[in-house]
């Protein structure tokens, strides 16, 4: 067997091992942003430890530093991304090849990136990074974050390993959405589950919603804000109890969009 063939075999074997470990499981998104009241490296690591204690099958984490620290503390498969915000583009999830390289070098098992039709800072549709990344880091597993069926179809054809409607509710076309698109996701699963690992991510706030996603064909489910962001959990309660006068979804969306860049070395330890 040639060296290239061996590498391909190793990737397929590693890929299957990782995906098997995530199958039918909960992936907890453990992320902190500079505007979060709980913003500290210590907190994000403890979130990941708590997720493992609770039975999570994997972790989704943001930024090389946070990925690195979580990998030191928790031995679960890790989906890594790098949120980089731009004043001229809505693409912020691992928007460049360099960002993807940093995620990979930090120890992520899977690289997540925006694969929507949104235009990136370079003036290209975000999804065009996918084939570039597959060529430049061929051993990496790639999680394509999309917002609709057509985007999912495209990334499956381009060879994404994992696909999820992560950005449903975060694009200009879907920004006012409050509920998961279970019907659209079910269609994705019916059409693409034999070609990619289908992950339900986005607007899952209860265990019952997660079970629905599995029933509809999800291979795994990602939950973030409903588990790991106490200020947003509180905001949802106060909004609902206050007669829906204070839009909790808007607060959630604004908490991750268009934040000013900040150096990770400025992150407090506790």
Language-model segments: residues:
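Short beta-strand/loop segments at the ligand-binding rim of alpha/beta enzyme cores
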Residues: 23-26, 74-88, 134-144, 191-201
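Active-site-adjacent beta->alpha loops and helix N-cap segments on the catalytic face
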Residues: 38-40, 60-76, 91-95, 115-133, ...
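Short, surface-exposed connector motifs at secondary-structure boundaries
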Residues: 49-55, 111, 133-139, 192-195, ...
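Short beta-strand segments at enzyme active-site cores
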Residues: 58-63, 67, 79-81, 109-114, ...
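C-terminal helical cap(s) of enzyme catalytic domains, especially alpha/beta-barrels
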Residues: 178-179, 185, 227-254, 259-264, ...
């Amino acid at each position: 067997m040639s060296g290239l063939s061996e590498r391909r075999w190793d990737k397929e074997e590693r890929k299957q091992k990782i995906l098997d470990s995530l199958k039918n499981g909960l992936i907890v998104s453990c992320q902190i942003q500079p505007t979060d009241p709980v913003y500290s490296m210590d907190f994000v690591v403890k979130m990941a430890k708590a997720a493992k204690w609770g039975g999570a099958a994997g972790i989704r984490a943001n930024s090389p530093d946070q990925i690195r620290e979580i990998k030191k503390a928790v031995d679960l498969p890790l989906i890594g991304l790098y949120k980089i915000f731009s004043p001229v583009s809505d693409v912020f999830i691992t928007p460049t090849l360099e960002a993807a390289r940093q995620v990979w070098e930090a120890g992520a098992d899977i690289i997540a990136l925006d694969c929507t039709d949104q235009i990136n800072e370079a003036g290209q549709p975000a999804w065009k990074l996918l084939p570039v990344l597959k060529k430049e880091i061929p051993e990496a597993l790639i999680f394509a974050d999309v917002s609709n069926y057509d985007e999912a179809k495209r990334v499956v054809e381009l060879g994404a390993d994992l696909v999820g409607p992560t950005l449903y509710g975060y694009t200009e076309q879907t920004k006012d959405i409050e509920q998961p698109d279970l019907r659209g996701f079910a269609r994705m699963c019916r059409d693409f589950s034999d070609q990619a690992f289908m992950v339900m991510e986005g607007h899952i706030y209860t265990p019952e919603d997660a079970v629905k996603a599995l029933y509809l064909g999800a291979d795994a489910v990602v939950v973030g804000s409903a588990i790991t962001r106490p200020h947003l959990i509180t905001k949802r309660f106060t909004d609902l109890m206050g007669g829906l006068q204070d839009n909790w979804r808007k607060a959630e969306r604004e908490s991750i969009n268009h934040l000013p860049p900040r150096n990770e070395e400025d992150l407090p330890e506790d």
